[in-house]
Regions:
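Surface-exposed patches in mature extracellular/periplasmic domains of secreted proteins
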Residues: 1-6, 84-88, 166-175
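A non-catalytic alpha/beta surface segment that caps or lines the substrate-entry region
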Residues: 1-35
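Solvent-exposed loop/turn segments at secondary-structure junctions
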Residues: 5-8, 39-40, 51-55, 94-99, ...
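Active-site-adjacent substrate-binding region
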Residues: 10, 130-233
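Acidic/histidine-rich catalytic neighborhood of metal-dependent amide-processing enzymes
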Residues: 27, 54-151, 155
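Soluble periplasmic/extracytoplasmic beta-strand elements of cell-envelope proteins
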Residues: 32, 46-48, 89-91
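Loop/turn elements at helix/coil->beta-strand transitions in domains of secreted/extracellular proteins
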Residues: 41-45, 83-89, 113-118, 161-167, ...
Length: 233
């Protein structure tokens, strides 16, 4: 992969631009953890998050995407000794470099005939506007692109209500595939969805050097992780 170049003529949060032809190439690895199911091991539930922060700006990436990475790790930790009927895989990829390594992961899954029955992308959990943060709102949006993804978005609403988790949970249908879930949709897995703190994304520190741990609403991240785990099982 290559780091994105920085185009300072663009708005600060969107200064990424294609790398130059002579820019340095790096080897980026997709990291997997796999827990095989006890009854239906051929059916795979996938949780994924991009593990890298922005390559064109010196951002710590606390919301984007340390929150999604930590949430995915926590789900793996909680399921380590749980008897899962279906297999649960965890994928950590790169999305702030080019090309996205989730593209390779999705294409490999299609080539190998992996029976992915649910795909959950965790990205920038809890990231929201300052107004929402100051108001104490615990927000989560589930994005889906194809009709096959809507039931998984609705499931987030159901578990939020059943278990009284306390999220302000909404859903939104995108017009085209995007982010790492979009890599899987483009590879023929239309059920893929993404969880994010707000949409349109409203964190004022988005893609900035100020995306630091201190402003992160960790309680919001915890609640979104709980709901994602509950809906995944």
């Amino acid at each position: 992969v290559k780091a994105f170049s920085c185009d300072t003529s663009k708005p600060k949060a969107h200064q990424y631009s294609p790398p130059t032809a002579d820019s340095t190439e790096f080897t980026a690895y997709n990291l997997y953890a796999k827990k095989y199911g006890s009854q239906y091991p051929e059916e795979v539930i996938l949780f994924l998050a991009h593990k890298d922060s922005q390559s064109w700006v010196d951002s710590p990436g606390a919301y984007d995407n340390c929150t999604g990475t930590v949430a995915t790790m926590e789900i793996a930790h909680l399921l380590a000794n749980h008897n899962c009927k279906r297999s649960v895989w965890f994928l950590f990829c790169n999305e702030e470099h080019t090309p996205w390594t989730s593209i390779a992961a999705a294409q490999n899954a299609r080539i190998k005939g992996t029976n992915l029955i649910a795909i959950f992308n965790l990205d920038s959990l809890g990231g929201k506007s300052k107004q929402s943060l100051d108001s104490g709102l615990k927000t989560n949006v589930t994005l889906y692109t194809e009709p096959e993804g809507e039931p998984f978005a609705d499931l987030m609403t159901e578990v939020n209500e059943i278990y009284n988790i306390g999220l302000l949970q909404t859903k939104f249908m995108r017009q085209r595939p995007g982010d790492d879930d979009g890599s899987f949709i483009n590879a023929g897995f239309p059920m893929a969805v993404m969880n994010v703190g707000s949409y349109p994304y409203a964190d004022p520190n988005y893609h900035l050097e100020t995306d630091r741990p201190e402003p992160v609403d960790i309680e919001n991240v915890r609640l979104a992780t709980q709901a994602r785990l509950a809906s995944g099982l």
